[in-house]
Each structure stands twice: as C-alpha cells, then as structure tokens.
Amino acid sequence: MLELDRINTFRGPAHVLNGVSLTVRDAESVVLVGRNGAGKTTTIDSIMGLLPVRSGTITFNGTDISRLPTHQRALAGIGYAPEDAGIFPDLTVVENFLISQSLARAAGKAAPTAGDSGIDERVLTLFPEVRAFTKRRGLFLSGGQKKMVAIARAMTLSPTILLLDEPFEGLAPVVVTRFIEAVTRIKAMGVSLLIAESNLMTASRVADRLYAIDRGEIIFEGEPRRAFENEEVMKTIRG
C-alpha cells in the first residue's frame, strides 16, 4: 500500500502541495483528478523522489520512503511513466527497453523473457502494437506510441504499483479506449495504479476511487460517481 500523509512540496519558492494525504491500496486503481496546475504532477514527482517533500511522509508497504533516492523507490516496486513519456529519442524502442531490462537484472529481479523482438514478452502483451516499430528511434514515434513504450517499459521492473502521469492526454478517443484496456489488464495482474488525469469522465472509466485536487489541496475523495454529484469538484474541473 502507498500512503501520503500531509505532504508539503515546493517547486523553487512556490508552495505547490499543501498537506496532501492519499492512499492507494493493493491492486486498486486510484485517479488523482484536477485541472492543469492543480498539483497532480507534483504529487507524482514527490512520490518518485523527483521533488523532495518539505514535510509529511510517504510510506510504501510499511516503509517510510520520503528520503529515498528515486532509483531506490523504483527498485522497491514503484513504476513510473511520465507525462512526456521519457523516451530516449536517439535510441530505438528495443534499446529503450534493454536499459530497463538490464536494470531489472542488476536489481535481482526476475529476468525478463525476451522474444524475437528482444523485448520482455510479458509487457508486450499490454501493447502488441509495439512489435511493429521496435526498431524505430524514439525521435520518430508518435505521441501515442511513446506513451505505449513508456507504460510497457515501466512494467519491466515488475512494479507492485504504477504511477501514470496524464497517460491519456492528447490521444484520440479510440486510442484512449485502447489505453484503458491496457490499464485494466495491468490491474488484473495485481498491480496498483495511481493515475494523474485532468478529464473527470476519463478518470471515472478507470478509477476504483478518485481524489480531486485543486491548488495543491485534496478537495474530494470517494467513488467516481460521487464526484459528479459534488458541486465543488465539478466547478473546479470545469475551471
């Protein structure tokens, strides 16, 4: 289980997160919804250690990870796919995967079963489409293709929780549905998910529970359908 207890995070002089608390239980899909600038990405970055928390605690499976470096959080079982996908542009898709697969081996994780593509077959089941462009450099991938690679690559380390920052942003509706299918499959593997999302309707399609954030503070927690009945949430999301 992942638990944030009253964390405060700054970006430079700006106080972005103000006492944020949330939990993600085992094999649960939780969505953090809010408009741009509300604090979603900062929350994800705080969990991954990309931004230091000024106060409060982040606990993962009973251990305080608030001061751990990013790579140790990843090795502890926290997977991460950033909003910009984080694909190395000058490397092929296979080479992008090989970096993660080598980290998995170095960490003593179960060795991925690489097929003819050279990529872990387990994660390719999430997005079989990736097989068609494994030799293409990251620079020449579409936005949707980059996101596919980022999510599948994050699964290489066999995380117990996966953090996804705006995975559906900029995708056509039919592609969003395809990504939601992949997220559902990840959850069926027993992996917990924390997803940052700005669209409440999309959030409701993947969330077991939903948190709404505005100006760095949690303003709602509950079932997705309840969010649509909450006047403050609806006003905030619509801007």
Residue ranges of model-derived segments:
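Conserved ABC ATPase signature
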Residues: 137-141
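The feature captures the beta-strand-to-loop junction immediately N-terminal to the Walker
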Residues: 33-35
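Conserved ABC transporter NBD signature motif
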Residues: 56-63, 76, 110, 115-118, ...
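Helix-to-loop junction immediately C-terminal to a conserved catalytic motif
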Residues: 48
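ABC ATPase C-loop
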Residues: 154-155
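Catalytic Walker B motif of ABC-type/P-loop ATPase nucleotide-binding domains
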Residues: 162-166
